[in-house]
Structure formats: C-alpha cells, structure tokens
Amino acid sequence: MTDNNLFPEPKKIVWRVSELNRHVRVILEQTFPLLWVSGEISNLKRYPSGHWYFSLKDDNAQVRCVMFRHKNMYLDWMPQDGAQVEAQALITLYEARGEFQLTIERLRRAGLGVLFETFERLKTRLQQEGLFNPEYKQLIPPYPQQIGIITSTNTAALRDVLTTLQRRLPSLPVVIYPAPVQGKEAASAIVTALQIATQRSECDVLILCRGGGSIEDLWAFNEEIVARAIAACPIPIVTGIGHETDFTIADFVADMRAPTPTGAAQLAAPDRQDILHRLQYWQHRLQQAIERNIERRMQTTDLLAHRLVHPGERIRYQLIHLSQLHNRLLHAWSRQLEVCKWRIEAFRRRIQFTKPDINTGKRYQQELAARLQRAMVYRLESLQVQLIRQQQHLAHLDPKAVLERGYSITYTAGGEILQDSQQIHTGDNVQIVFAKGSAKANITETNK
C-alpha cells in the first residue's frame, strides 16, 4: 500500500538522487523493525577501522551487510566465509551508492536459536521448581579447611584458579576432581566429579570452572543433569564459567556465581592479609578485655583488703569488749551488794522495833552479812578464773601465737588460706607464712 504523502506528484517536485535515497532509507528504517535473517557469509572483509563488510546469501539471493566495530567486538567467535549464521539486523539503504543493505546488530551461528530456546525453557522450568531460590543457597564458609576444583586439567582456567589460591592463602589444601568441560561426555563427567566429591566429603567448598568460549563450548553447564547434581550437592559450590557476560544454568543453581575462574577462587578462599588483620583486631579486643578484667579484679581486691581486719586486731577488740563486760559485772555486783546491805539494815531496824532480843537478831544479821560477803568473794573469784581462761583461750587463737609455737600458714596463689589438698594441684605456687618471714613453694605432689 502506497502513501501518496510520501511521494508528491512529479509535476510539482523533481527529486534529486541524494534526496530520494535519503527518503527511501528513512522509510525502510521506520517501516521494518529489527529482524532475524539466516544465510551464508560470503566476501567477508575486515577493515582496519574494525568494521566488517560481507554478504548474506542463500540459493536464490544475497544482500549486502555491515557490522560495525562497536557491535562485532563482543563476539566470542570469528566468522568465516561459508559459515551459516543468523543475524539480527536493521534494514537500511547506503545513500552514497543507493545500495540496499543490512546493518547487523547481533550475529550467531546457525542453530543457536534452538539452543537459546532450549536454554530458556530449562531455565524457566527449573526456576518454577525453586532450584534458583535464595533460601536453598548454602553459605560459602569464610575459612574453608580444604577446597575442591572441578575442571579439566592442563587448562588456563585451572592455572588461574591455582595461582589465585596460592596468592591468597598458600597454606590452603586443594583437591582437583578432573572432568572434561566441553564435548558430549562433559555433562556426565561433571556429574560424576560432583558425586565423587560428595562421597569423599573432604572439601568445605567446591569451585566449578572453565574458561571462555561459545555457547556450544559452554553447553555442558546448561544440561539438566548438571543443574540437578549441583542442587543436590551438600557441599557449597562456587561457579566461575566463561567470561563476565556468560551465564549458564549452572550459575543460576550454584550457591554463588563468579564472573571468571579467578573470581571464583577469590570468593572461595579468604585472603591471608584479611585473616591477619582480623586476628590482630580480635587479639587487640581480647587484650583489652583481659586488661579490663584484671583492673576490676584489682579494684575488688583493694576493696576487700580495706575491709579485711587482721586476726590480731579482732582479738584486741574481743579483749576490750571482755574488759568492758568485766567492769559492768563488777559494777552490777557492787550495786547488788549495796541493795542487800540496805535491805539488811532495814530488816535490822524492823527487828529492833519489833523484838526486844536485839543482840540475837544482830548476831544473826552479822552472820548473814558474813555469809553474803563470802558468797560475793567466791562469785567474784569464780568469774575472775573464767575471765583468765577466756583470755588464755583468745591468746591461743592469735595466729602470731600459733606461728611462734612452730606452726605456719599456707596461702594459695589467689590469697586464700590453704585448708584442703583439693584446693591445689601439682605445679601450683603457694606462699608459706612463718612467725618470722615467709617463703614461696611449688607443689610437686598432692595426696587427697
């Protein structure tokens, strides 16, 4: 269908060639969206500018194509004449020559569309099953005791991983589980390596890696059996497959994805300097805690020492108290004696007024007074004897007196008086206090 507004009537305007070509280019670019075209590459020319020029052809026709440098630089493979490809292109017109051409945005080998569809279908199905869910991801141990590597031997990827591990933590043991990572048997070999690592259970984390390549080269990591083996593995897995722009099904299922094999090694192994810095930090924290604890204990010791009374002082206080009790007792007996005397005198006076035989009553009163005097003297002497005994008993309890009799007092390293052999152990230090001086000793044997 032709829009009459696009081409004015010939009688009114005569088009110049450049105007016509520009107008046709605009119509083509605005009319046709990006589309995929398949064909065979021919006459491929790579210019110093980095741009590629070639033709796409089939059995019946061909079309000129251009792929600019900022587009082709991201290809991980090099097209050749005769290669069957699929190109995502914008239809345009090269105005200078009036040539119809395709500006290529993306280029892939023929058949990769099927691979991408297979990739997306499997990705969607596994995602719906929950294999990509974060809650199923295992934590990567911060300080693994041993690391396992699943990859092909004698490859740049393996060398990069080993070099990185050696640089970050040279003392970390490494186990290599060799498996081809490209080809028809690669997927089953990777699954077998994962099973062996699980059975041997000798590593804390696994690195699954390989270098860059095309989608076909990396396809083993898009196989369902590999994805399910990774999901079932009880050992945390870090993937480092291809380059940063490469994503595989294995990356989505793994516990952690790194952009490259080197990046996987950096995620799996801690850096020695970081460990040293962390150890220094905790050493400093521990030292501060110990110093604060010692300071608190010293303050507590000073407080207890201030409150602690020497045994000699306690005996002196007891003697003073005993002397006070003695004085109070004497004062009480004196008062009681005065009361008794007053009563006797009152009784004597009453007798004198009531009975004529004053002499008999007086003799009886004198006898009672003498008996009372003897009783008082006897009681005082008895109390005096008890007081002397108490003083002697207190004197025997004085640690200095005990030490002067040839005994000694042994203290533990914590300052406690040693009363039981279970308070100490072989190798402990003790302090022995004598009547004069002290000594330190080391325990070589204890008997329970």
UniProtKB/Swiss-Prot annotation:
MF term (GO), any: exodeoxyribonuclease VII activity
InterPro entries membership: Exonuc_VII_L, Exonuc_VII_lsu_C, OB-fold_nuc-bd_dom
EC number: 3.1.11.6
Keywords annotated in UniProt: Cytoplasm, Exonuclease, Hydrolase, Nuclease
A UniProt-annotated Pfam family: Exonuc_VII_L
Subcellular location: Cytoplasm
GO biological process, one term: DNA catabolic process
Cellular component aspect of the GO annotation: cytoplasm; exodeoxyribonuclease VII complex
Reactions listed under catalytic activity: Exonucleolytic cleavage in either 5'- to 3'- or 3'- to 5'-direction to yield nucleoside 5'-phosphates
EC class of the enzyme, as a word: hydrolase
Stated role: Bidirectionally degrades single-stranded DNA into large acid-insoluble oligonucleotides, which are then degraded further into small acid-soluble oligonucleotides.
Family assignment from sequence similarity: Belongs to the XseA family.
HAMAP family in the cross-refs: Exonuc_7_L (MF_00378)
Subunit structure: Heterooligomer composed of large and small subunits.
UniProt protein name: Exodeoxyribonuclease 7 large subunit
Source organism of this protein record: Nitrosomonas eutropha (strain DSM 101675 / C91 / Nm57)
